[in-house]
């Protein structure tokens, strides 16, 4: 019994170093020395003792050191022929049997704890490195996707608004372009019409100008022709006190003829008064005047007729100068006269000129007939 208790005592401390690696080796070596110094243990073979100590967690060096300290390294177990060593051989085995369940249990618990700790640490590392990023990444991805979806919806709304605005602006621009094109076409039509009207007006104006030029030239010619012929003079009026009283006599027709011949134009009178040759060649007319006035007043009648003719000639010259000035003013104003006025003036001048010429011709012819009749009588 004592040997079994001694065997259990070193087995308990030897189990502790196997379970705890932190405990120093000196106590284990001391317990192993005590275990080897036991008399019963000495009887067991060396290999069994070494195997037992190895089971307790000692290394080969520690086992050798324990054998050296115990002094049993050189001891040999007794021979196999003796019957006494059989029991001690079985005693270490019997001593080891009660110690194995406790140590193995603690060893299993420690190993299980270590394995669980390693598994937990591995799971923690896996969760930290792989699972957590996946979980957090999925959430962040979802948040980012939600943000992107909201931003895309906002962008789509803004794009739709901009598209509608662009469409409205394009429609307004197209309407403006259409209006501008219509205005341009209207302006082009107006320009074409204006060009056509201006061309026609230019042609008409050129024609009117040519007509006016031709009419002005004709007017100038007519005015020049009028200057060549004197204007129609008014019949000279004799005062009533100078008109002699007619006496019934056979020479009345001659007097009538001579009275009709007194209506000769002042041009003829002027020509007769200015040319003494004509006076010398027409003594018959002077005698006719003398017969009109009577034999008693011959000298006074001749004097009065000459003065009257001179006055009439002077008046006609003044009238002619006034008319020439008026004609010059009319020639200056002819360029400003309208077409109708020019035509009317032209027609009136033509009519007046022709009538005056005819009247002058008739009046010039009358005294010749009267003189012929007086010569016949």
From Swiss-Prot:
InterPro entries: PEX14, Pex14_N, WH-like_DNA-bd_sf
Entry function: Component of the PEX13-PEX14 docking complex, a translocon channel that specifically mediates the import of peroxisomal cargo proteins bound to PEX5 receptor. The PEX13-PEX14 docking complex forms a large import pore which can be opened to a diameter of about 9 nm. Mechanistically, PEX5 receptor along with cargo proteins associates with the PEX14 subunit of the PEX13-PEX14 docking complex in the cytosol, leading to the insertion of the receptor into the organelle membrane with the concomitant translocation of the cargo into the peroxisome matrix.
Keyword Transmembrane listed: yes
This protein's name: Peroxisomal membrane protein PEX14
Alphabetized Gene3D superfamilies for the sequence: Winged helix-like DNA-binding domain superfamily/Winged helix DNA-binding domain
Membrane topology: Single-pass membrane protein
Residues bearing PTM N6-acetyllysine: 34
Positions where Phosphoserine occurs in the chain: 232, 282, 335
Family classification: Belongs to the peroxin-14 family.
Ranges that cross the membrane: 109-126
Taxonomy, superkingdom: Eukaryota
Residue stretches of biased makeup (Low complexity): 1-20, 244-259, 265-275
GO molecular function, one term: identical protein binding
GO cellular component, as recorded: peroxisomal importomer complex; peroxisomal membrane; peroxisome
Keywords (A to Z) from UniProt: Acetylation, Membrane, Peroxisome, Phosphoprotein, Protein transport, Translocation, Transmembrane, Transmembrane helix, Transport
Modified residues (N-acetylalanine): 2
Biased composition (Acidic residues): 323-342
Transport in keyword set: yes
Compositional bias of kind Basic and acidic residues: 360-377
Residues exposed to the Peroxisomal side: 2-108
One GO BP: protein import into peroxisome matrix
């Amino acid at each position: 019994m004592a040997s079994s208790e001694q065997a259990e005592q070193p087995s308990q401390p030897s189990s502790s170093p196997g379970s705890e690696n932190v405990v120093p080796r000196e106590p284990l070596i001391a317990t192993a020395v005590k275990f080897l110094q036991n008399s019963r243990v000495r009887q067991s073979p060396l290999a069994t003792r070494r195997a037992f100590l190895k089971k307790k967690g000692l290394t080969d060096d520690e086992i050798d050191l324990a054998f050296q300290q115990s002094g049993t390294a050189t001891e040999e177990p007794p021979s196999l022929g003796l019957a006494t060593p059989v029991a001690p051989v079985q005693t270490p085995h019997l001593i080891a049997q009660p110690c194995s369940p406790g140590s193995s249990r603690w060893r299993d618990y420690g190993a299980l704890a270590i394995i669980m700790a390693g598994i937990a640490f591995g799971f923690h590392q896996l969760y930290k490195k792989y699972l957590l990023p996946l979980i957090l990444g999925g959430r962040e991805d979802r948040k980012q996707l939600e943000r992107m979806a909201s931003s895309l919806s906002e962008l789509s709304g803004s794009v739709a608004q901009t598209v509608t605005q662009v469409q409205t602006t394009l429609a307004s621009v197209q309407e403006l372009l259409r209006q501008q094109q219509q205005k341009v076409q209207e302006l082009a039509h107006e320009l074409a019409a204006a060009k056509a009207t201006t061309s026609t007006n230019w042609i008409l104006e050129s024609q009117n100008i040519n007509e006016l030029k031709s009419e002005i030239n004709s007017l100038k010619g007519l005015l020049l022709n009028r200057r060549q012929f004197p204007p129609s003079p008014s019949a000279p009026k004799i005062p009533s006190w100078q008109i002699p009283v007619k006496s019934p006599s056979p020479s009345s027709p001659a007097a009538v003829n001579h009275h009709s011949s007194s209506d000769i134009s002042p041009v003829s009178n002027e020509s007769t008064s200015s040319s003494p040759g004509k006076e010398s060649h027409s003594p018959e007319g002077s005698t006719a005047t003398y017969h009109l006035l009577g034999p008693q007043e011959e000298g006074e009648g001749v004097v009065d007729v000459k003065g009257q003719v001179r006055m009439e000639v002077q008046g006609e010259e003044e009238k002619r100068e006034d008319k020439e000035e008026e004609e010059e003013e009319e020639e200056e104003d002819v360029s400003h006269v309208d077409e109708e006025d020019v035509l009317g003036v032209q027609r009136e001048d033509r009519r007046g000129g022709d009538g005056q010429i005819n009247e002058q011709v008739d009046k010039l012819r009358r005294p010749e007939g009267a003189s012929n009749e007086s010569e016949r009588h």
